[in-house]
UniProtKB/Swiss-Prot annotation:
The keyword Cytoplasm applies. Its EC number is 2.7.7.87. The gene is tsaC. This is Threonylcarbamoyl-AMP synthase. It is an enzyme of class 2 (transferase).
């Protein structure tokens, strides 16, 4: 079965996400692989694919801040901290927020926080809007290999049958910057 999704096949991607599958899609800099953040089965599949330990935690990517609110606690942010976050969104900056106790450990790992981003990539915005929630999102690459920047690279690393939403990345050279929403501390340079 060929699961490659032609560009614009958002409905097919949503169907695969609803079936707890992991899919690949273009983001601002590289292709990402993602899944339903509320499905432990889907997240376990993603972690196995990436050979990533669950304790490292994951990133959620969303079309809007509203989609992220069930997973984070922004109540302790000051007006200045909130402004610093919203000045960067939508865009390629990921912020680490406190996470409420209801956020699943398969997302937060060993942390009491969660990394989240509101994307400005039009295809991912459309995908998250059609799905109605954020996606777990991590770079599309197998352990020890560079992140994929094209559909062809995704197919080379993950196989011809891996479901790929075809499209172009946003042209950025580096993955998203990661900052603490409370302190502004830089965890990863973008």
């Amino acid at each position: 079965m060929n699961n490659n999704l032609p560009i614009g096949s958002i409905a097919a991607a949503v169907d695969l996400l609803n079936k707890e599958n992991v899919i690949a899609y273009p983001t601002e800099a590289v292709f990402g692989v993602g899944c339903d953040p509320d499905s432990e089965t889907a997240v376990t599949r993603l972690l196995a694919l990436k050979q990533r330990p669950v304790d490292k935690g994951l990133i959620l990517i969303a079309a809007s801040f509203e989609q992220l609110k069930p997973y984070i606690d922004d109540s302790i942010l000051t007006a200045a901290q909130r402004k610093a976050v919203f000045d960067c969104w939508p865009g390629p900056v990921t912020f680490v927020f406190p996470a409420p106790a209801t956020t699943p450990r398969w997302l937060t790992g060993r942390f009491d926080s969660l990394a989240v981003r509101v994307t400005n990539h039009p295809l991912v915005v459309a995908l998250c809007n059609a799905y109605g929630k954020p996606l777990v999102s991590t770079s599309a690459n197998l352990s020890g290999l560079p992140p994929c920047r094209t559909v062809e690279e995704v197919r080379a690393q993950f196989g011809d049958d891996f479901p790929v939403v075809e499209g172009a990345t946003g042209g950025r050279l580096n993955p998203s910057e990661i900052r603490d929403a409370l302190t502004g501390e830089l965890f990863r340079q973008g």
